[in-house]
Amino acid sequence: YRAKPTDRQQTAAGRLLDSPEVDLVLGHHAHVVQPVIRRDGDAVVYGLGNLLTNQPGDEANPCRSCPPQTQDGLIAWFQVTETANGAQITDAGYVPTWVDRTTTHEIVPIGVDDPEQVGPGVLAESAVRTAAMVEPALRRLTFTAG
């Protein structure tokens, strides 16, 4: 569970962004949120975290090798605008998510109808960990009822 991209990941992302055909690179499978970088209207999301997991972690079957960061994830959003010089990312945001590892393995979008059975401190800590990895490259999206 590496919170930072490897040299290989960084080299590959840089080479992809060097191409005029690539504006966005989305990485996955790190099982933890990894940094987001913006470069000249392009972006790299190195790791989206866990959006689906069957790793154990409930009281009956704890995952001793799974740090809390393996329950973090994000839904990324990008606005792409066509310009005279090609496409450019003109806005970007995210919604932090948290994996409930009890019987449902539900993905909880933090700040969107948070479930009562999950302590608010748990969700807040997850959101802080995610923000530390992706801000300021992405802004946190908020939702209002109604």
Which positions does each model-derived feature cover?
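A short C-terminal boundary segment appended to hydrolase-like catalytic domains
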Residues: 53, 60-146
